[in-house]
Amino acid sequence: MCGINGIIRFGKEVIKEEINKMNKAIKHRGPDDEGIFIYNFKNYSIGLGHVRLAILDLSEKGHQPMGYNVDEDKIIYRDDELDRADIIIVYNGEIYNYLELKEKFNLETETGTDTEVILKLYNKLGFDCVKEFNGMWAFCIFDKKKGLIFCSRDRLGVKPFYYYWDGNEFIFSSELKGILAVKEINKKENINKDAVELYFALGFIPSPYSIYKNTFKLEARQNLIFDLDKREIRKYYYWELPDYKPIYDKKKLIEEGKKLLYDAVKIRMRSDVPVGAFLSGGLDSSTVVGVMREFTDLSKLHTFSIGFEGKYDETPYIKIVVDYFKTQHHHYYFKERDFEELIDKYSWIYDEPFGDYSGFPTYKVSEMARKFVTVVLSGDGGDEVFGGYMTHLNGYRMDFIRKLPKFLRVVGSKLPVKKDLNGIANLYLLKEAFRLSLINPEEFYAESIKEDAIRPEIYKKWTIEKLRYCLNKGDNKLGEALRIFDLLFNTLCDNFLVKVDRASMLTLWKLEVHF
């Protein structure tokens, strides 16, 4: 949707050309407009930059950086007038419930943007304003009167936020390339060893790590408060997954699930530009398209898909859905030459090691979609919410096995079978299940990979810490914990959501996730 940049520096002024370089580095995220704000105080200097992809209120009133003069109750959206503002924001994302928030808090607004709602709600509620938001966001607010910087990232980390801090400079951007435009950290001695080890174990680098030292990702559901007078940074989680008990009443599950899904799709279709949908042929994206028919004419809806040569092609399933819903469908077959064309571009797109090869077809389908629409709905997150991965099923099986007497599990863990023996693979898996049932549930991931080469200590520490949190939230059931683990830490935030953010921003449109 957009891109944000900024520099906070002590002892030396930020110059406009630096922010201009950062904006240029991520211009692909926002081709419609850009803005810069520079502020020099007695002991610090601030520069903020923004590149815009217009979705809501396409007029100049959506320009950023955007400011708010509290005494005059006036929104300022011209760069040359921002000195009059008390609060200035650069923001990437969308607050879906901004209209409801305007009504709830009696906010008088001058623009049709959700950016203005964030500014005025921050002025009214302070840092707790994010607790009211239903949406995806990464933003930085400069509060002149309080002398602080307030940064925040949405609950699941849909929108990215990278920052560099060395005690003298705080530099942030929507992508690492924004930071690299003004800071020479792309050197061998700056490579973060822990991040490299986590990458080889996970296939991505999880928050708060980045590939470089002193450079971090703001974590999902996290606020960062920077006291500029004290040079102190404080981070905290503004949201925790509520404690809950699983619902086993099928009727109640269907009723609540349907209501939540319909509400999610409806509110994400708010837009002043054309909306389409990805369609993979799977349950998640097909369900989203099915729900969309309640709020739009599907005969005018553009849907997009990718096919492959060979056994992994799901084109027949896609065709079934398209024939049923009668959408305006666009299909592309991903070929070997597409891979060859993109391979050299891959490292530039993702800035740091990223091992999900599905990023290649995601880029191609995004490129195709941009010819027809500006906003695309997808089915990402469905497996994490509904327990759709085999690891989740294995976790539920493990919960059952743990109910067996311990002596039986000990005997089972010593079955004289090996992994490479033909014909008894299921016996080996059963032996492994018995073995894993004897360890603490929080060590499930740390112990399920035996090869030390791809199970470094930092990986063990990271998975144990995250699974412990998930077990506490999941009624101490491993199946529930593994689902929460994927939702909050593993498959979504720094993996799948990174993939779709980079692909969509590079091809200039906004992607919405629903589950």
Swiss-Prot record:
EC supergroup of this enzyme: ligase
Enzyme Commission numbers on file: 6.3.5.4
Residues noted as binding ATP in the record, renumbered to the chain: I306, S378, G379
Pathway: Amino-acid biosynthesis; L-asparagine biosynthesis; L-asparagine from L-aspartate (L-Gln route): step 1/1
Positions contributing to L-glutamine binding: R52, L53, A54, I55, L56, N92, G93, E94, D114
UniProt-annotated site: Important for beta-aspartyl-AMP intermediate formation, residues: D380
Superkingdom of this protein's organism: Archaea
Pfam family, one: GATase_7
Gene Ontology MF annotations: asparagine synthase (glutamine-hydrolyzing) activity; ATP binding
GO terms (BP aspect): asparagine biosynthetic process; L-asparagine biosynthetic process
Reactions it catalyzes: L-aspartate + L-glutamine + ATP + H2O = L-asparagine + L-glutamate + AMP + diphosphate + H(+)
InterPro entries noted in UniProt: Asn_synth_AEB (IPR006426), Asn_synthase (IPR001962), ASN_synthetase/amidase (IPR051786), AsnB_N (IPR033738), GATase_2_dom (IPR017932), Ntn_hydrolases_N (IPR029055), Rossmann-like_a/b/a_fold (IPR014729)
Keywords from the named record: Amino-acid biosynthesis, Asparagine biosynthesis, ATP-binding, Glutamine amidotransferase, Ligase, Nucleotide-binding
Residues annotated as catalytic: C2
Cellular component, GO annotation: cytosol
Residue ranges of every copy of the Glutamine amidotransferase type-2 domain listed in the record: 2-229
Disulfide bonds: none
Keyword Cytoplasm: no
Family to which this protein belongs: Belongs to the asparagine synthetase family.
Protein name: Putative asparagine synthetase [glutamine-hydrolyzing] 2
Lineage: Archaea, Methanobacteriati, Methanobacteriota, Methanomada group, Methanococci
